[in-house]
Curated annotation (Swiss-Prot):
Gene it is expressed from: MAP6
Protein source organism: Homo sapiens
Annotated region (Disordered), positions in chain: 36-283, 314-651, 756-813
UniProt keyword Nucleotide-binding present: no
Protein's name according to its UniProt entry: Microtubule-associated protein 6
PTM-bearing positions, type Phosphotyrosine: 143
Tissue and organ expression note: Expressed in brain (at protein level). Expressed in spinal cord. Isoform 2 expression is up-regulated in the prefrontal cortex (Brodmann's area 46) of patients with schizophrenia (postmortem brain study).
Length: 813
């Protein structure tokens, strides 16, 4: 039976009296019922027949408890009666049952006189008896001394005997009376002063102790015990009484028993008392003792805990190295270190730690100083963009510088991520060319450039104004951007303002030239921003502000880059982003400025928005709106199908831009990546055609995306408005941002996008018209980028380190 804990030995071992007399039904502990009756406290129980009367003797409660739960054989009937007898086979059972029934508890014992045999219960219990476990180990009440003498010393004590510490005056070199060998000692009493055990014996090893123990048992426990307790003075007598000398004797000071003497010693002792008197004998004995001590027979603390000198130390096994470095020399350069090279990596320099450290130190102290490889222009590119108000011309130079710088940066970054940077570089270069071509077209746009140029270089200033303009056009968006771009707001709003209000148109008007410029501007930023966008959405979602800045900065190059980059950027953009991010970092200032007007205000709103949108749509938007037409139419076519999905997605996406845009972007990225590549290139370059086409495309996309725009516009419309104003492309990015960034960027861009979104929803209506389509497309265009955003996102990380200060600081407002 599986009884609970009560039956465990630990419980069974408790005092039986307490167990039995407890008023709880512990008797489960008993394995056989008879045990219940054999209380240690109760008088010896009579045989079962009388037993039933007997139980009264036991304390009633205990009796009742014991009996009720597991009655003894004698009491089974009583239990049966108590429980209410089942009609018994014999007539006796019934009469007995009566009394039992009346008093189930204490009355049990007094109950029936009937023999145990008559009860049905008895049969039941008999059946139990069959299964009864082995007889219980419960101690019997009376103590039966065992035949073997009681061992007073427990095994524990034997195992942990006190060490045989020598007595204070015990010096082995001082002659002591020799101990007599077993034979002689048995015959004659010891003569002379009681001799302490020789040291060899005092320190006798445990084996000896064990032997002694065995012997101790033989001669007689009492003698051994007495000897153990005997004091030194009595030792003689004890020994005499005890019998053979080797009976274990516990010398008082020595914790150890005396054990049979070694043969040599026995001989010495055999010589008898005479020998004991002689000094020679003592010397011999001591010599013997010393030998024995030396022979490790002795045990003492010194010996016991002696270092194991004779054991050879284990020869450590050298584990085979798990990692076998490749035979060819390892390149200890990470993509990170490659990116932040102080100088162009010279093979020898790489190994020179001092130079390397100096390079890194300078890198961190002057993070924007790019390696010679990268060309300082990139550094300057960011600053000139900020500082130079030379608008388009400087912008051109800046774009070139930024692009070259970015290209260089990308080259440096290419070491770490070759493919992405390459794409970025190529796309940037292409974008630069496109941007330059547009710039040449847009040279007149210089003015616009001023309008947008401010966007480019003075964007902060212009953008300040632009924002108001943007505020007008992008007002809603800009206003939030105002917050982010607060400073930017004052100047650019004017520029962008008109641009933005009309951005589709104004941007057209602004774009007309600026569009050209913007195409370049946007194209570069678009590029970067395209990449930025992807990143920005990611980066921008976090970095939105930064991105905005970055994007702003990105936009300049990105616009250029992005023109092409849109195509590549979609591809490159993801990769580009890192570089763009880097570029953007530096570019941020300029870009922010460059696109600042457009982007800055938008950057923040549109920061994300501008980048991509800036790309295709930035340039494309004004003219590109037309431009984007083709692009859009192609993308829209590509994306239109996508758009429908994306529109749905994007509408959803706008709402849940990330979702849709993620998906939308994917497709759009694909389509627009493809489409954009062509269109972007074309768009930047072909802006006119595409613009026209895009216009139609936009319109159609608007239709396709119109729905999307509405939702997207709703979500992204805000973006779109900004984008519309800033740039269709911008819209794209916001879609990105919105798709991606919107959730997060919305945070950063929330001020930018969300508020602008809200404001721009109104704006959206206006921009939505032209750019609604453009936006959708940009959404799509950027949508595609969005997909890449994921790809870019890692890159954004790279980016973050580079331009983080600018991005975060500037955009943090």
């Amino acid at each position: 039976m599986a009884w609970p804990c009560i039956t465990r030995a630990c419980c069974i071992a408790r005092f039986w009296n307490q167990l039995d007399k407890a008023d709880i039904a512990v008797p489960l502990v008993f394995t056989k019922y008879s045990e219940a009756t054999e209380h240690p406290g109760a008088p010896p129980q009579p045989p079962p027949p009388q037993q039933q009367a007997q139980p009264a003797l036991a304390p009633p409660s205990a009796r009742a408890v014991a009996i009720e739960t597991q009655p003894a054989q004698g009491e089974l009937d009583a239990v049966a009666r108590a429980t209410g007898p089942a009609p018994g086979p014999t007539g006796e059972r019934e009469p007995a049952a009566g009394p039992g029934r009346s008093g189930p508890g204490p009355g049990l014992g007094s109950g029936s006189t009937s023999g145990p045999a008559d009860s049905v219960m008895r049969q039941d219990y008999r059946a139990w008896k069959v299964q009864r476990p082995e007889p219980s180990c419960r101690p019997r009440s009376e103590y039966q001394p065992s035949d073997a003498p009681f061992e007073r010393e427990t095994q524990y004590q034997k195992d942990f005997r006190a060490w045989p510490l020598p007595r204070r005056g015990d010096h082995p070199w001082i002659p002591k009376p020799v101990q007599i060998s077993a034979a002689s000692q048995a015959s004659a009493p010891i003569l002379g002063a009681p001799k302490r055990r020789p040291q060899s014996q005092e320190r006798w090893p445990v084996q000896a102790a064990a032997e002694a123990r065995e012997q101790e048992a033989a001669p007689g426990g009492a003698g051994g015990l007495a000897a153990g307790k005997a004091s030194g003075a009595d030792e003689r007598d004890t020994r005499r009484k005890a019998g053979p000398a080797w009976i274990v004797r516990r010398a008082e000071g020595l914790g150890h028993e005396q054990t049979p003497l070694p043969a040599a010693q026995a001989q010495v002792q055999a010589t008898g008392p005479e020998a004991g008197r002689g000094r020679a004998a003592a010397d011999a004995l001591n010599r013997q003792i010393r030998e024995e001590v030396a022979s490790a027979v002795s045990s003492s603390y010194r010996n016991e805990f002696r270092a194991w000198t004779d054991i050879k130390p284990v020869k450590p096994i050298k584990a085979k190295p798990q990692y076998k470095p490749p035979d060819d020399k390892m390149v200890h350069e990470t993509s990170y270190s490659a990116q932040f090279k102080g100088e162009a990596s010279k093979p020898t320099t790489a190994d020179n730690k001092v130079i390397d450290r100096r390079r890194i130190r300078s890198l961190y102290s002057e993070p924007f100083k790019e390696p010679p490889k990268v060309e300082k222009p990139s550094v300057q590119s960011s600053k000139p963009k900020k500082t130079s108000a030379s608008h388009k011309p400087t912008r051109k130079a800046k774009d070139k510088q930024a692009v070259s710088g970015q290209a260089a940066k990308k080259k440096s970054a290419e070491g770490p991520s070759t493919t992405k940077p390459d794409d970025k570089e190529q796309s940037k270069e292409m974008n630069n060319k496109l941007a330059e071509a547009k710039e040449s077209l847009a040279q007149p746009v210089s003015d616009s450039s001023k309008t947008q140029g401010p966007v480019a270089t003075e964007p902060d200033k212009d953008q300040g104004s632009v924002v108001p303009g943007l505020l007008k056009g992008q007002g809603p968006m800009v206003q939030e951007p105002l917050k982010k771009q607060g400073s930017v707001v004052p100047g650019p709003p004017k520029d962008l303002g008109p641009m933005i209000p009309l951005p589709v148109k104004d941007q057209d008007h602004t774009v007309p030239e600026p569009l050209k410029n913007e195409s370049p501007v946007i194209s570069a930023p678009v590029k970067d921003q395209g990449p930025s966008v992807p990143v920005p959405p990611k980066n921008q979602s976090p970095m939105v502000p930064a991105k905005v800045k970055d994007q702003g900065s990105v936009v300049p190059e990105s616009l250029k880059d992005q023109g092409p980059r849109i195509p590549e950027p979609v591809k490159n953009q993801a990769p580009m982003v890192p570089a763009p991010v880097k570029d953007e970092g530096p570019m941020v200032s300029a870009s922010v400025k460059d696109q600042g007007p457009m982007v800055s205000a938008p950057v923040k709103d549109q920061g994300p928005i501008v980048p991509a949108p800036v790309k295709g749509e930035g340039p494309i938007v004004p003219a590109p709106v037309k431009d984007e037409g083709p692009m859009v139419s192609a993308p829209i076519k590509d994306q239109d199908p996508m758009v429908p999905e994306h529109p749905k997605d994007e509408s959803a996406m706008a709402t849940a831009p990330i979702k849709n845009q993620g998906s939308m972007v994917s497709e759009p990225v694909k389509n627009q990546g493809l489409v954009v590549s062509g269109p972007v290139k074309d768009q930047d370059v072909v802006v006119p055609e595409h613009a026209k086409v895009h216009d139609s495309a936009v319109v159609a996309p608007v239709k396709n995306q119109g729905p999307v725009v509405p939702e997207s516009v709703k979500n992204q419309d805000p973006i779109l408005p900004v984008l519309v104003k800033d740039q269709g492309p911008t819209v794209l990015q916001p879609p990105k941002n919105q798709g991606r960034i919107v959730p997060e960027p919305l945070k950063n861009q929330v001020p930018i996008v969300p508020v602008p979104l809200k404001d721009q929803d109104p704006l959206v209506p206006v921009p939505a018209k032209d750019q609604g389509p453009a936006v959708p497309e940009p959404l799509k265009t950027q949508g595609p980028r969005d997909p890449q955003l994921p790809t870019v996102s890692p890159l954004p990380r790279v980016m973050i380190p580079t331009a983080p200060h600018t991005e975060y600081i500037e955009s943090s407002p």
